[in-house]
């Protein structure tokens, strides 16, 4: 079959999740947080463009390698059985080629940045590649995802400021904790299928304590975000934004009250608003 026919192009779009931008947005927001803090509200346009493009490319690469890693189990999960690899619309070889194309283009973008950013990028690529395989070996794959989704933070800060002060690691910690919380919501959707096929997740690990642990993670992220605002001497608008974030977290808790799959997925999607509100608070907080 022609590698570039309409059916194949659609399969590649789905492999890269271009049709589902939520993951790109969840990766973009903390990257923008880091850029705005590193630049005190006025990031370099070139760095902003490079990292915005890099977020799209590396999230796409992560999705492709995730589907490659899960190609033999996705067919047994209701939500994923129609993905390109289990449905036969794309091959494993095509997925690997697509992954390397995306990774290479991402690295070419990184090469336009300073040496510290380039050095950090190697760990980022390793995390992106490793995460999909972790759900077979650890009950905390969401922690590895948190590391992978947070690595753009020190990279973006390094690109803008050519330094990694302590505040970077506060943002880093916030995002890891937030990622574990929202990806546990995502994992709650697949919990029954994952138990059947032996895939591990925090949704399974937390079991009946899932809601309270998610709430504690969300509360911890808010406390650290408040500390960040105090250290950066941000104005009152930022702290109003955090109150809104607290309201969004409360709404998510109400949504997942009965652990209904559709509601859990909706709560996961709502985290896009969390990321946006924090960014808006930072944007206005530096004015």
From Swiss-Prot:
Enzyme Commission numbers on file: 2.5.1.39
Gene3D superfamilies referenced in this protein's UniProt entry, alphabetically: UbiA prenyltransferase
* Cited PROSITE patterns: UBIA (PS00943)
Query: Which key words are in the record?
Result: Cell inner membrane, Cell membrane, Magnesium, Membrane, Transferase, Transmembrane, Transmembrane helix, Ubiquinone biosynthesis
Which EC class does it fall in?
Answer: transferase
Q: How does it sit in the membrane?
A: Multi-pass membrane protein
Listed under GO cellular component are: plasma membrane
What is one Pfam family matched by this protein?
UbiA
What InterPro entries is this protein classified in?
HB_polyprenyltransferase-like, Prenyltransferase, UbiA_prenyltransferase, UbiA_prenylTrfase_CS, UbiA_sf
Q: Where in the cell is it found?
A: Cell inner membrane
Cofactor(s) listed in the protein's UniProt record? Mg(2+)
Q: List the transmembrane segments.
A: 22-42, 45-65, 91-111, 114-134, 139-159, 161-181, 212-232, 236-256, 267-287
The source's domain of life comes to Bacteria
Q: Name one GO molecular function term.
A: 4-hydroxybenzoate polyprenyltransferase activity
Q: Name one GO biological process term.
A: ubiquinone biosynthetic process
Q: What catalytic activity does the UniProt entry give for this protein? A: all-trans-octaprenyl diphosphate + 4-hydroxybenzoate = 4-hydroxy-3-(all-trans-octaprenyl)benzoate + diphosphate
Protein purpose: Catalyzes the prenylation of para-hydroxybenzoate (PHB) with an all-trans polyprenyl group. Mediates the second step in the final reaction sequence of ubiquinone-8 (UQ-8) biosynthesis, which is the condensation of the polyisoprenoid side chain with PHB, generating the first membrane-bound Q intermediate 3-octaprenyl-4-hydroxybenzoate.
Checking HAMAP family in the record gives: UbiA
**Which family, according to UniProt?**
Belongs to the UbiA prenyltransferase family.
Protein name, per record: 4-hydroxybenzoate octaprenyltransferase
């Amino acid at each position: 079959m022609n590698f570039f026919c309409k059916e194949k192009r659609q399969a590649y779009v789905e492999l890269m999740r271009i049709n589902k931008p939520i993951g790109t947005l969840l990766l973009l927001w903390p990257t923008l947080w880091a850029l705005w803090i590193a630049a005190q509200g006025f990031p370099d346009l070139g760095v902003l463009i490079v990292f915005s493009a890099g977020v799209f490319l590396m999230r796409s690469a992560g999705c492709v390698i995730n589907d490659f890693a899960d190609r033999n189990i996705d067919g047994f999960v209701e939500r994923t059985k129609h993905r390109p690899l289990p449905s036969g619309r794309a091959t494993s070889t095509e997925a690997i080629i697509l992954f390397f194309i995306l990774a290479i283009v991402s690295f070419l973008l990184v090469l336009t940045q300073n040496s510290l950013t380039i050095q950090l990028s190697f760990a980022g690529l390793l995390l992106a590649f490793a995460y999909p395989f972790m759900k077979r070996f650890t009950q905390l794959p969401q922690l590895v995802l948190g590391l992978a989704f947070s690595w753009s933070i020190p990279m973006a800060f390094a690109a803008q400021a050519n330094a990694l002060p302590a505040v970077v690691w506060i943002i880093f910690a916030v995002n890891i904790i937030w990622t574990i919380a929202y990806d546990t919501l995502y994992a709650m959707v697949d919990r029954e299928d994952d138990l059947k096929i032996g895939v591990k997740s925090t949704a399974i690990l937390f079991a009946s304590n899932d809601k309270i642990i998610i709430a504690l993670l969300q509360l911890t992220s808010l406390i650290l975000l408040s500390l960040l605002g105090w250290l950066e001497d941000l104005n009152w608008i930022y702290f109003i934004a955090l109150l809104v974030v607290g309201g969004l977290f409360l709404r998510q808790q109400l949504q997942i009250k009965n652990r209904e799959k559709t509601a859990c997925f909706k709560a996961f999607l709502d985290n896009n608003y969390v990321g946006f509100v924090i960014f808006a608070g930072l944007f206005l907080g530096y004015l």
